[in-house]
Amino acid sequence: MFISSSLIFTQNKKSSIGVALYRFDDNYIKYLKSYIEKNIGNKASLTILDSHNSQITQNDQIEIFLNRKVNLIAINLVNESYAQTIINKVSVRNIPIIFFNREPDLEALNSYNNVWYIGGSSENAGTAQGRVIADSWKSHANWDKNEDGKIQCIIIKGRTNSVESENRTQYMKDYLKKNNIKLNILAEVYAFDNRKTASIEMDKLMAKYSQKIEYIIASDDNMALGALDSIKKLGFNNDSRMLNYIPIVGIGGTPEYLEEIKNYSVFATVMQNPSTQAEVLSKVSLNIINNKSPLDGTTLSFENNKYIFVPYIPVTMFNLDRAIEIYK
């Protein structure tokens, strides 16, 4: 039953799981939360808290879980750099931790036996994004506006202290370099995972580079949509024939972004299936609280004894229907 807009509680005396989500109003997280609830069902007591995109709030929520003596804490970090701080606090109680969806570094995970990560790999995300950019560049010769063989691009990244965002961008660049595709980066800016901020930053860049930009590459769909908001005001990406068009490529696969692919407003994204991520998280969590091996009864495997990676899949108009079906 619902206690408040940011708290869900399901009664079960046998075992308990506390989940902290970085923000409920993120479209992808909204579906992830729903799938977690569905997979856990009545198999455990489940408390899900909304961290409202505040690491301070999330830290307080960890204290709530500790005071309630939950059997496992699952955390979608607001800020990956706080993973070690959380591990230090929780490990004293010897409570298992699963980080998910936002990837902490291996050094932090190796500091405690009972901590793991489930979700995407920033390497996989960036590589998949690089692949979809490379494939589209090779198949659309007309997108090379100045015919110099280089991609004139804007790169939009998340928070300045986000290792995941930086890694996504770097692995994208690495893939393109390995495939002999050169980038001419007109600007590389931070938009803090925020659509409005991305739109404001893009407004400034369009004033300077509007006729030069050949790609907009964002490390998150939300920021990619912010870029779209900006360029649409100047008449770009408003035509299904893809005239006066700047290809935009994001990461995430949110329902709203997929709708814009359908409208020919953005070109592509790479996504994880939230149902798959929630299913893996739920199976591993239930195994742990029932004193089983984390991977018991699954075909899953660990990387570096700590990571269970859920792959990213490129999404364009060609496989869009399959991606949309995930959210139904």
Language model features: what each stretch is:
Residues 15, 150, 155-160, 279-328:
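Hinge/cleft segment of the Venus flytrap/periplasmic-binding protein
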Residues 58, 117-149, 198-199, 253-257, ...:
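Hydrophobic alpha-helical segments within soluble ligand-binding/sensing domains
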Residues 16-35, 39, 47-59, 70, ...:
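Extracytoplasmic "Venus flytrap"
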Residues 40-51, 155, 177-192:
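Short beta-strand elements in bilobed, periplasmic/extracellular small-molecule ligand-binding domains
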Residues 75-92, 172, 186-259:
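Hydrophobic alpha-helical
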Residues 62-73, 95, 209-214:
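Short acidic/histidine-rich motifs immediately flanking catalytic phosphotransfer sites
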Residues 27-42, 125-129, 163-182, 197, ...:
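Short, solvent-exposed amphipathic alpha-helices that sit
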Residues 88-124, 149, 255-262:
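Flexible loop/hinge segments that line or gate small-molecule binding clefts
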